[in-house]
Curated annotation (Swiss-Prot):
Pfam families: CDI_toxin_EC869_like, CdiA_helical, Fil_haemagg_2, PT-VENN. Its cofactor is Zn(2+). It is found in: Target cell, Target cell cytoplasm. This is Deoxyribonuclease CdiA. A motif (VENN CT cleavage motif) lies at residues 781-784. Residues 67-384 are annotated as: FHA-2. Residues 954-1077 are annotated as: DNase activity. It comes from Yersinia pseudotuberculosis serotype O:3 (strain YPIII). Residues 531-546 have a biased composition (Polar residues). Toxic component of a toxin-immunity protein module, which functions as a cellular contact-dependent growth inhibition (CDI) system. CDI modules allow bacteria to communicate with and inhibit the growth of closely related neighboring bacteria in a contact-dependent fashion. The C-terminal 123 residues (954-1077) has DNase activity in the presence of Zn(2+), converting supercoiled DNA into open-circular form. Toxic activity is neutralized by coexpression of the cognate immunity protein CdiI-YPIII, but not by non-cognate immunity proteins from other toxin-immunity modules. The CdiA protein is thought to be exported from the cell through the central lumen of CdiB, the other half of its two-partner system (TPS). The TPS domain probably remains associated with CdiB while the FHA-1 domain forms an extended filament with the receptor-binding domain (RBD) at its extremity; in the secretion arrested state the C-terminus of the RBD and YP domains form a hairpin-like structure as the FHA-2, PT and CT domains are periplasmic. The YP domain is probably responsible for this arrest at the point where it re-enters the host cell periplasm. The keyword Nuclease applies. GO terms for molecular function: deoxyribonuclease I activity; toxin activity. Interacts with cognate immunity protein CdiI-YPIII, which blocks its toxic DNase activity.
Length: 1077
């Protein structure tokens, strides 16, 4: 570091790398050849290795034991390269940097209290690139001997235990609920399997057997992530800023100004003067993900039970990969308080850059190009799985084969301009002269000045728009098939493949970033070579950037695929239950028939047998078997439970319909919005079978009634009981509950079981949002500023006016007056009774905004909705102002006053020296206080607010890791937590919250809601596993959320942050806040 009152250094070459040159007054650095102010590089690398080997006796996860060896190995390698910039700065004086040849400023800052001037033959100002790479691998292998239960009941019990364990380990509410339903239905299957064996005359030995198998299973996964993030240079002048590229007497090969991914700011004027070219460019932040996984295994063994001895073999294989890459731009910005002037001897290019000044003047010798840049984010993942097994009887029983295959794919593409390239002038206007051609590609020349102050004089003018697009697709294809004798270790339905044939989901959004020039004079001198009609150029610069945000949520779509798979498996279980019930009914019927065989039955059976076996004579045993089989088949078909029967087809249709809704708010969707879709799927699935169609609608009717009834499921299996569903199904089928036949009772039981499973698994994670049938939305608060009634009336009047083509300003003024009058009353309430404003008016105002956010499809349920987007915007603006007023003026002290008025809390208040003082002022001060533990610079963290996870979230996560023990980093995309210290049991979740969005500034309550959501997820964490790493609640001793917020977070927002901190304490979660400036 070089520090002095003033500094004047002259040399042939000057280099400042990762250092500081600071003076109170003037600084002048003069190099006869090259002057470089750049960064010092730092590199870090680390490797974490976890390896575990086990041998001997272990659990299988179900009811069984495993004898063999197990091995797990994970490696995590990281490498980080970062750059520490230099600083050249004068507190109160001028800064001049001069070079005879090249002047380079790289990832560094130059600050002048007064004027700042850079001069060189060529001047380059660029951004440093910080990079981080991580390679994570996980391997597991297991081989040995497995002893487990087999037989119809034994296999069912084993499946139920395994599935229940999976439900306990699942963190996502709805997935846990579906797993719980699977476990419960496995119990039903176990009971049924025993009933069927008993009906067939068997005992305990036929129900349960033992299987012994020798096998192996191994899996591996790899993931590599690479990130580069730029850290731009910054030039700041208290007065004027100038950059000049002289060309050094060789203008043919030099004389360029290049500024990339950097920020220039001057309180006065800014001037760029280049003998040749001026380039203002964006700098790219990049991320890349590559991953793959594979698994395979198999086993061979024998199963012994009352039904005989069987030899079986199983095999499975799976593989997948993912690819992701993204580019996100850091724009060059020039911000001048006075005039911005530019001269280039040849070309001037702005690509990913914004120039802002009160007045803009530019003289371009040849071509002027302005071009916006699109952020890009692409992702593609594929996964395939296949498994199969065969069981061959050695003695007794029957052969069986099962096959299962599935394939998933996720694909997403995102391309959109975020920050539009442009020249933005204030009241001084723009004056641009271009020697030859001006090209605007999705860029603007904008001015707030009167049209007579804006001129563009060019040889020719070209312009084009940029199309922004976001699209994603999610596909699932799969099925399973099992045939043959008794139920084996796989209890999925024989028709599972027909249940889960496939699913598709997707999304699409688009926008247009237009080229535009503000109103003013455009002169095209070379009309002969002008290609486009200038009249086609947009003059609306304020609405030119039709940017769109990302619409693909990878985790949500992956969970959607899991839900579809689980719904299909639940449906398969329900179909198996129905089929087994049909077998039980048929077996009882056949047994009864054998007790009362008539002579004509014997004659008919003999003819049937001999027709099926030409040339052979039937024995008495053959005839008896034929009588039994005929009675069995007739009863099974009449029961409706067989393949193609109305019960089976109705259940299949209901399952297919509900699968199509997977992933969203199932409770809300089922209660009416998707009724046409559901009806269409049912009709397609059941065809012309009215009984099947009616049964499918009965199942969905029961699920819908359950969802709309707001029953609190909370993910618990079995809460949605078949008894609860049965009355609705009986009613839908048009049957009398007092006169049901045995067959009808069995049908109701099977349909109720399916309805309970679907409702229980699907609504458990979202019952708080479920709509109560046709009355949905009618219970909203009816008193809002504008209250809901006023908002709806305003909406109708404005919509009718617009349709008539009249002048609608009078309508808007009328309702604004109503809003203003009610806002005046709010001011009085805030002054005289602020607590009332907090507990009543605030809820009322929020209700007004809530009605603007109701989706249009709710109108089909009888709910009132607003249709005019214009009216919605006005209500949101007016009510948002009142909400902001309430949050700023009342929430802090009112909440604290309520707290302090409790005698049990007054000791704490007195310890703060507040008792006996003005409680209102003290509370306001206390609740609105800044409770951050530290303040750090954004450049040291490497983050930028409001620019997405890549530029905001990930840098903060990396920064937090620098303060934690080496080796505590969890794998990328680990659930809930980012760091876990195995030595102490401490877990940390790193979060960043941009409080400066319009939504959070106008409604500070959103700050509390966002933090509370993170606290709840942290507090309720039970277990997560990824890439061979497992963390469960028993391993955790302390939980912490490390939160980053902008340094200019408002006092009202700090009130909400402090509320969240107190809430976290009650939940056992520590919230630590750091300000980032």
């Amino acid at each position: 570091m070089l520090s002095a009152g003033s500094i004047d250094v002259s040399s042939q070459n000057i280099a400042v790398a990762g250092s500081s040159v600071v003076a109170d007054k003037d600084i002048r650095l003069r190099a006869q050849e090259n002057l470089t102010v750049s960064t010092a590089q730092q590199s870090e690398s680390g490797t974490q290795l976890f390896e575990q080997k086990k041998s001997g006796l272990m659990s299988t996860g179900g009811i069984g034991v495993f004898i063999g060896t197990s091995r797990q190995k994970t490696t995590d390698q990281t490498q980080t390269v970062s750059h520490i910039g230099s600083t050249v700065g004068s507190l109160t004086g001028n800064v001049r940097l001069e070079a005879g040849n090249q002047l380079t400023l790289h990832g560094s800052d130059v600050v002048a209290g007064k004027d700042l001037a850079l001069t060189g033959a060529d001047v380059a100002i660029s951004a440093a690139e910080n990079s981080r790479s991580q390679q994570y691998t996980a391997e597991s292998k297991q081989s040995g001997l497995t002893v487990a239960l087999s037989g119809p009941v034994g296999s069912a019990v084993n499946t139920a235990v395994t599935t229940a364990k999976a439900a306990r380990e699942e963190n996502t509410g709805r997935l846990a609920g579906l797993q719980g339903v699977k476990a419960a239905l496995s119990g039903v299957q176990a009971v049924q399997a025993g009933q069927l064996v008993q009906a067939q005359g068997g005992g305990i030995t036929e129900m349960v057997g033992v299987s012994v198998s020798l096998g192996s299973q191994k899996s591996s996964s790899q993931q590599q992530q690479e990130q580069t993030q730029v850290s731009g240079s910054a030039l700041t002048a208290g007065n004027n800023l100038s950059i000049k590229a002289t060309g050094g007497g060789n203008a043919a090969n030099s004389g360029d100004i290049l500024i990339a991914g950097s920020q220039l700011k001057a309180g006065g004027d800014t001037r760029l003067d280049a003998a040749r070219d001026v380039q203002l460019l964006g700098a790219a932040n990049r991320q890349k993900t590559d991953g793959s996984n594979s698994s395979r295994g198999g086993s061979i063994g024998v199963s012994v039970g009352g039904s005989g001895l069987s030899v079986f073999a199983n095999a499975n294989k799976g593989q997948g990969n993912e690819r992701g890459d993204g580019t996100f731009w850091t724009e060059t910005t020039v911000d001048s308080g006075g005039m911005f002037s530019l001269r280039s001897g040849r070309d001037t290019t702005l690509t990913g850059a914004q120039v802002s000044a009160e007045t803009v003047k530019a003289d371009v010798g040849r071509n002027l190009t302005l071009q916006s840049q699109q952020d890009r984010d692409n992702y593609d993942a594929k996964q395939s799985r296949a498994s199969g097994g065969i069981s061959v009887p050695v003695a007794g029983g029957g052969a069986a084969v099962n096959l299962s295959m599935s394939r998933d794919r996720l694909s997403s593409q995102y391309d959109s301009v975020q920050a539009q390239t442009g020249i933005f002038a204030g009241s001084g206007g723009v004056d641009i002269r271009v020697g030859e051609h001006t090209q605007l590609d999705g860029a603007v020349i904008a001015s707030t000045a009167a049209a007579d102050k804006n001129t563009l004089d060019t040889g020719t003018l070209g312009f084009s728009d940029i199309k922004n697009k976001a699209v994603f697709t999610v596909e699932h294809q799969g099925g399973s098939l099992s045939t043959g004798g008794p139920v084996g270790s796989d209890l999925l339905s024989n028709l599972g493949g027909m249940v889960l044939a496939g699913l598709g989901n997707g999304g699409y959004a688009e926008g247009t970033t237009q080229a535009a020039v503000s109103e003013g004079t455009i002169t095209v001198r070379d009309t002969e070579n002008q290609q486009q009609n200038v009249d086609d150029l947009s003059r609306d610069t304020g609405n030119a950037n039709g940017s769109i945000g990302p619409i693909f949520d990878k985790e949500k779509e992956q969970n959607r695929l899991k839900e579809v798979q689980l719904i299909g498996e639940i449906g398969g279980q329900a179909l198996d239950i129905a089929s087994t019930q049909g077998k039980i009914i048929a077996t009882h019927a056949a047994n009864d028939k054998m007790k009362a065989v008539k002579p004509e039955d014997i004659v008919a059976a003999e003819k049937q047998w001999e027709k099926a076996h030409p040339g052979k004579a039937a024995t008495a045993e053959d005839i008896n078997q034929q009588i039994y089989q005929t009675a069995y088949n007739q009863a099974f078909n009449e029961s409706g439970f067989g393949t193609g029967g109305p019960v089976q087809r109705g259940m299949q249709a209901a399952i297919a319909a509900v699968q199509g809704l997977a992933g969203g708010n199932m409770g809300a969707a089922l209660t009416g919005a998707s009724a046409p879709y559901l009806a269409g799927v049912i009709k397609q699935s059941t065809g012309d079978n009215p009984a099947a169609n009616t049964m499918a609608h009965a199942v969905l009717g029961a699920v819908t009634a359950y969802a709309s009834g707001n029953h609190a499921l909370a993910g618990a299996a079995g809460a949605a009981t078949a008894e609860l569903m049965a009355p609705t199904i009986i009613s839908a089928l048009g049957w009398d509950k007092n006169t049901l036949t045995e067959g009808q009772k069995q049908a109701v039981s099977a349909l109720s079981t399916l309805a309970a499973g679907l409702a229980g698994g699907l609504t458990g994670d979202s019952t708080a949002d479920a709509l109560a049938g046709g009355q949905a939305g009618k219970n909203a608060v009816e008193n809002n500023y504008l209250n809901s009634t006023q908002a709806l009336t305003f909406d109708k009047e404005l919509s009718d006016c617009r349709k008539s083509g009249g002048n609608c300003q009078a309508v808007i003024d009328k309702w604004k007056k109503v809003s203003d009058e009610q806002s005046v009353k709010l001011d009085e309430t805030l002054k005289n009774n602020p607590l009332e404003a907090q507990v009543w008016d605030k809820e009322v105002a929020q209700g007004g905004i809530a009605i603007t956010e109701r989706p249009g499809w709710l109108s089909s349920l009888g709910a009132d909705v607003m249709s005019s987007e214009e009216a919605k915007a006005y209500v949101q603006q007016w009510n948002g102002q009142d909400l902001s007023k309430i949050d700023v003026n009342s929430p802090g002290w009112t909440k604290f006053a309520a707290f302090a008025s409790d005698p049990e809390n007054q000791v704490a208040v007195a310890s703060l020296g507040m008792l006996g003082k003005d409680l209102t002022k003290a509370a306001l001060s206390y609740m609105g206080r800044n409770t951050s533990t530290a303040t750090v610079s954004a450049s040291s963290v490497g983050m930028k607010w409001g620019q997405g996870n890549m530029k905001q979230g990930m840098p903060w996560e990396d920064y937090v890791g620098k303060t934690l023990p080496v080796g505590s980093r969890l794998p990328p995309n680990f659930k809930t937590y980012d760091y876990f210290d195995r030595a102490t049991g401490a877990v940390v979740s790193a979060k960043s919250l941009d409080t400066q969005t319009m939504a959070k500034l106008s409604n500070p309550n959103q700050v509390y809601s966002s933090i509370k959501k993170n606290i709840d997820v942290t507090a309720k964490f039970e277990k997560a596993s990824l890439s061979g790493v497992t963390v469960n609640s028993s391993m955790i001793t302390s939980k912490e959320v490390r939160l980053a917020v902008p340094v200019n977070t408002t006092k009202a927002q700090w009130t909400e942050i402090n509320r969240a901190i107190e809430y976290g304490k009650n939940q056992g979660v520590k919230v630590t806040v750091t300000q980032v400036k």
